Design a protein with these regions (language model features):
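Surface-exposed patches in mature extracellular/periplasmic domains of secreted proteins
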Residues: 19-24, 54-58, 175-184, 356-370, ...
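Intrinsically disordered, low-complexity linker/terminal regions across diverse proteins
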Residues: 36, 223-227, 245-249, 306, ...
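Short amphipathic alpha-helical segments with coiled-coil-like heptad repeat character
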Residues: 11-25, 168-180, 376-378
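Active-site-surrounding "flap" and adjacent substrate/cofactor-binding loops of secreted or lumenal enzymes
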Residues: 2-7, 11-77
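Secretory-pathway/luminal and periplasmic proteins that interact with or process carbohydrate-rich
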Residues: 16-19, 194-204, 350, 377-388
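Noncatalytic, helix-rich "gating/capping" subdomain that lines the substrate-entry/channel surface
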Residues: 48-343, 347
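Extracellular/periplasmic catalytic domains that process cell-envelope and extracellular macromolecules
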Residues: 1-4, 126-128
Length: 429
């Protein structure tokens, strides 16, 4: 038997590891995954009853979730619809004729959740966590990290080949010709290889103290002179921003000026067409759902796709996650239990503060800053006291299609996210 002092992990977990099995549709197993599985099975049982009209919730928000889940889980209807629900978007993107036409529609596309290649976001300021500010990120790579693009990395070309093969099987489903597919993939892969030279590696992204690069708006907009950013942000947030935080400086200084240009329109158009085809794969036929996940399963080492019933529940839960969490907490985590945990956490914080005040091995300034941080912690225990106001807007129209309702939910979420710009962080969410 393994001795404690020789291998602590093996001593504690050895017997469990001998019999533990990773589910075919999961990347790992363990105590937390077991809990996740148990909750998933419970929700499958409960939501199954709701779909059958049994024990229906009285809450109007959850009633809309039930309607949405029914649509997502109506696999016969999804098979019958095929790709028809997304062809208008694909044809709209295909019809774009120029860089100018594309840039004129950027604001509209952003608010509608359509492909637009604008890597901007709103989140708290590193230096003032009380306020939400504008961030300029970068486009995403195909491969998991920049290191996969380095010369001598054998895994990179292998994964890229798997990605391309998946796309070559997937795109014909959306009425792209063989010539169109080759043109799109050639252009996207070439641009991706160039992009990899300028975006941060995963290791660089982990060094948060080096990611904070604030720019005055007048300076930032000169980095991409062919993008009408003032028009874009006026449409999206109602005005021109005053500043932007740029963690991806190489991307914006060395890649973006030539990428976002009329001269690069054909590459941009290829990327947009690919995005239009991929955006809705989770809502279409089972064949398309499974096929579109091949590359992701390869990266994560998951041998089998998630069963369609579980995938449908996860998809439907997305827009209603906090409402479902609140319902679950009401069933499993009483207000008394919540108050008890909140009291314990508050006690723990006071203990930390007391120990910091007596920690004479720390500099006084360090102790003071640590206590300041403890004083502003807002613990989130179990469930929120209120739901975001947007939840009341998430009303499902049963006369519309699944994709039309999902589109409406996306637009509500997008508008809510942008409304946070230049506003205090709501710690109750």
């Amino acid at each position: 038997m393994t001795r404690l002092q020789d291998d602590f992990y093996e001593y504690v977990n050895g017997k469990w590891a001998e019999t533990a099995v990773i589910p075919d549709d999961k990347p790992s197993t363990g105590g937390f995954m077991d809990l996740d599985r148990d909750i998933e099975n419970l929700m499958l049982d409960i939501t199954g009853k709701w779909q059958r009209g049994e024990e229906l919730p009285e809450d109007s928000i959850l009633q809309n979730f039930v309607k949405y889940h029914k649509m997502v889980a109506d696999f016969d209807a999804r098979e019958a619809a095929g790709v028809a629900p997304v062809m208008p978007l694909i044809n709209e993107i295909k019809a774009l004729s120029s860089f100018e036409e594309y840039t004129n529609k950027l604001g509209t596309y952003e608010l509608a959740g359509k492909p637009n290649l604008m890597p901007f976001s709103v989140s708290p300021d590193f230096m003032n966590a009380q306020m939400n500010v504008l961030w300029g990120e970068s486009l995403a790579l195909i491969l998991p990290d920049t290191t996969y693009y380095e010369e001598g990395n054998e895994k990179g070309p292998e994964l890229l080949a798997i990605w391309r093969q998946m796309m070559e099987k997937l795109l014909p489903k959306f009425e792209f010709s063989e010539a169109e597919i080759k043109d799109i993939l050639d252009k996207v892969i070439a641009a991706d290889a160039e992009l990899a030279k300028y975006v941060l590696s995963n290791e660089e992204r982990s060094e948060y103290n080096k990611l904070y690069h604030p720019y005055e708006w007048e300076e930032f907009k000169t980095l991409v002179p062919e993008l009408p950013l003032e028009t874009f942000f006026t449409e999206v947030i109602g005005q021109t921003p005053d500043k932007i935080i740029v963690p991806e400086e190489r991307f914006w200084k060395e890649f973006a000026p030539t990428y976002y240009s009329a001269a690069n329109w054909e590459t941009i158009h290829a990327k947009l067409k690919l995005g239009a085809a991929l955006d809705w794969t989770s809502f279409l036929t089972e064949e398309i759902r499974v096929l579109s996940g091949e590359y992701g399963r390869t990266i994560t080492g998951i041998p089998e796709p998630r069963p369609k019933e579980k995938a449908a529940l996860a998809l439907a839960e997305g827009p209603y996650s906090q409402a479902l969490g609140l319902w679950y907490a009401g069933e499993k985590f009483s207000p008394e239990a919540k108050a008890d945990v909140e009291h314990k956490v508050a006690t723990m914080i006071e203990v930390y503060k007391d120990r910091l005040e007596k920690a004479d091995w720390l500099a006084p300034e360090t102790r003071e800053k640590a206590i300041v941080k403890l004083n502003v912690i807002t613990p989130h225990i179990g469930y929120p006291e209120k739901l975001p106001e947007t939840y009341a807007k998430k009303i499902i129209d049963e006369s519309k299609t699944l994709v039309e309702n999902a589109q409406a939910l996306y637009e509500i979420s997008i508008a809510h996210t942008w409304s946070k710009w230049n506003q205090p962080v709501d710690r109750s969410e």
